[in-house]
Every structure is written in structure tokens, then in C-alpha cells.
Amino acid sequence: MSRHYEIVFMVHPDQSEQVPAMIERYKSLVENGNGTIHRLEDWGRRQLAYPIQNLVKAHYVLLNIEADQAVLNELTESFRFNDAVLRNLVIKRDEADTEQSLIMKSKDEKGDKPERGERRRRDDEEGETTPAADNDAGDDAASAA
């Protein structure tokens, strides 16, 4: 009997380049077991709430699947034996979630907003334009004299 599950797993940030291959492996595991994937989201590297193995960031992946218990057991076992997977969470759902998650919606809304460090540099640059304009005026006055 197939049930709906929501799965989130976190991958070691040094293994981020292997995440697409891991996703493909887990997708094929579900599909070969006659399961279906209703939603798959790669959230990328995100800040952890607390350090895990002295790490402050991890690569997050969300899966919403419909599969039977044997497939789920195989999936959780593969998480357990994969050293790159830091944590995983499996939640049984009443129905399939196919709409975009809140995290992905907030990423889309931010869209082209600069990263935190970039924003700070831009603010610094904007703050410098006013004194720079004063200096230019002063330079013009000095060159005229």
C-alpha cells in the first residue's frame, strides 16, 4: 500500500557537488520501487540552527514521494549509510504536496536581491558617494584656485 511522505535530508557542505547525483540515485530508487515523486526541491546551502559535526551550513533537499514501506525503508537505510547525509527527516502525509514550499517561494520572492554581504557593500558604496561628491567639488575648487 502506497503512502505519501515528505522527506528532508541535509548533506555535508563539502559534498554539495555530489547532491545532483545523490538526488538521481534516490529518485531512481523510488521510481524502481513503483513509487512516484510529487515534488523535489533543492534548497541549496542553508544556515543550520545549531552546529552539527562543527558545521554551520548544510545542503538541504526536499522530496515528496508516494511509495510503499519497503521503498521507504530502503531510502532511509541509504541515508543512514551515506556519510555525506548529516540528518534526515521523514514525515507521513495524508496527501501529496505538489505546490512549491515556503522556502522556495521566499527564494523566488527575493529573486534578484543581493546576498547579505553584497547588500552591505552596496550600502557602503552609496554612503561613500555623498562624501566623494563633496571631495570632487573641493577638488574642482582647489584646481580653480
Swiss-Prot record:
Q: Coiled-coil stretches, from where to where?
A: none
Q: Bias regions of kind Low complexity — which residues?
A: 132-145
Where is there biased composition of kind Basic and acidic residues? 105-124
Lineage: superkingdom:
Bacteria
Segments for region (Disordered): 97-145
Gene Ontology terms, MF aspect: small ribosomal subunit rRNA binding; structural constituent of ribosome
Q: Does the record's keyword annotation contain DNA repair? A: no
Q: Which Pfam families does this UniProt record tie to the protein?
A: Ribosomal_S6 (PF01250)
BP terms from Gene Ontology: translation
For this UniProt record, give its keywords in alphabetical order, as a comma-separated list.
Ribonucleoprotein, Ribosomal protein, RNA-binding, rRNA-binding
- Extract one GO cellular component term from the record: cytosolic small ribosomal subunit
List the InterPro entries hit by this protein, alphabetically: Ribosomal_bS6 (IPR000529), Ribosomal_bS6_sf (IPR035980), Ribosomal_S6_plastid/chlpt (IPR020814), Transl_elong_EF1B/ribsomal_bS6 (IPR014717)
Q: Which HAMAP family match?
A: Ribosomal_bS6
Q: Its biological function?
A: Binds together with bS18 to 16S ribosomal RNA.
Sequence similarity? Belongs to the bacterial ribosomal protein bS6 family.
Protein name according to UniProt: Small ribosomal subunit protein bS6
Q: Which gene encodes it?
A: rpsF
